[in-house]
Amino acid sequence: MSNISLIVGLGNPGSEYAQTRHNAGFWFVEQLADKYGITIKNDPKFHGISGRGNIEGHDVRLLLPMTYMNRSGQSVVPFSKFYQIAPEAILIAHDELDMNPGVIRLKTGGGHGGHNGLRDIVPHIGPNFHRLRIGIGHPGSKERVSGHVLGKAPSSEQSLMDGAIDHALSKVKLLVQGQVPQAMNQINAYKPA
């Protein structure tokens, strides 16, 4: 099993989107950077914000595409190709409509599952990367999805998402060590307090 050496957070750039549910992937990577003291800075060559640092003795790159969600591939694809990072060594953190707030799942492979950020990445690097799916809940009807993902969660939901993200952050050491099955078991077993 490959060591994870690129961790990507999906979201939308700009302060107006910073606290919206669609930015759950950004939240994860920003908190990871804080936890390990990794500076992330503007990286115009790859249309994003990136950083490189040491996580538990492993060299890891972080990337936040600044392309807007639907064009995430314009950042992730050239970045991973330039640094020669195989899909199996990539973790992409993103919001997940089909899971409730407080639920978090690590998954390897699969399609885009209707997620527009993944939809722009999968055709170019294939499906074999790892996904950290952060539950944001579904509004109930398809017509309300856009407003839901681009809306701010009430504090009760936000605290559930924060707890799930904190739990996943504590398992990153397993991912960078290549212990993906163990990380998957521990992340997927999480239950909100």
From Swiss-Prot:
It comes from the Bacteria. Keywords: Cytoplasm, Hydrolase, RNA-binding, tRNA-binding. One of its GO terms (molecular function) is tRNA binding. Its main location: cytoplasm. The record marks 12 as: Discriminates between blocked and unblocked aminoacyl-tRNA. TRNA binds at residues 17, 68, 70, 116. The active site is at 22 (proton acceptor). Gene3D superfamilies: Peptidyl-tRNA hydrolase. It catalyses: an N-acyl-L-alpha-aminoacyl-tRNA + H2O = an N-acyl-L-amino acid + a tRNA + H(+). GO terms for cellular component: cytoplasm. Transmembrane segments: none annotated. One of its GO terms (biological process) is rescue of stalled ribosome. Its EC number is 3.1.1.29. It holds the Pfam family Pept_tRNA_hydro. It is an enzyme of class 3 (hydrolase). The record marks 95 as: Stabilizes the basic form of H active site to accept a proton. It is found in: Cytoplasm. InterPro entries: Pept_tRNA_hydro (IPR001328), Pept_tRNA_hydro_CS (IPR018171), Pept_tRNA_hydro_sf (IPR036416). Coiled coil: none annotated. Belongs to the PTH family. Monomer. Hydrolyzes ribosome-free peptidyl-tRNAs (with 1 or more amino acids incorporated), which drop off the ribosome during protein synthesis, or as a result of ribosome stalling. NCBIfam families: pth. This is Peptidyl-tRNA hydrolase. The gene is pth.
